[in-house]
Amino acid sequence: MTIGWGGIGTLWGRTALTVYVAEKRYTKEFMDKAEYFTVMTFDVKDSKVLNYMGTKSGRDDDRSATQGDACPDKKAQALGLHTAYTANGTPYYTEAAMVIECKIMYAAPFDPQYFKSDAPKRMYANFPAGIHSMYIGEVVNAWKK
């Protein structure tokens, strides 16, 4: 997945990675069904990959890293990306500079009644993708090229 919001730290005695996915994003459908997820980094020289992944929805362009080889992603293949799977069955691109695999420990949407500032209220008032859900994953594997 391509994320703009996230963090890494320690929670419940575990190394944890937190990601946020808006309710109308295609990725959310997969996150809600998944037991594991991967987050990848790419070299700066691969900015075309990041731009593509951050702007093209899997709804419109079947990205194989979310759907497996049954739905090949022609654009990702044209970018030179190849899908592989972890021992847990979680997809990732072999060209990633770093892959972090997480097991989901917690998932819930933000509840507006708990917003303590006007910043999220203002943002969501004009945000067509809907409110975000927070996913906290225990880091179970990490690979670096």
Would you name each region that the model predicts?
Residues 1-145:
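Active-site-proximal mixed secondary-structure blocks
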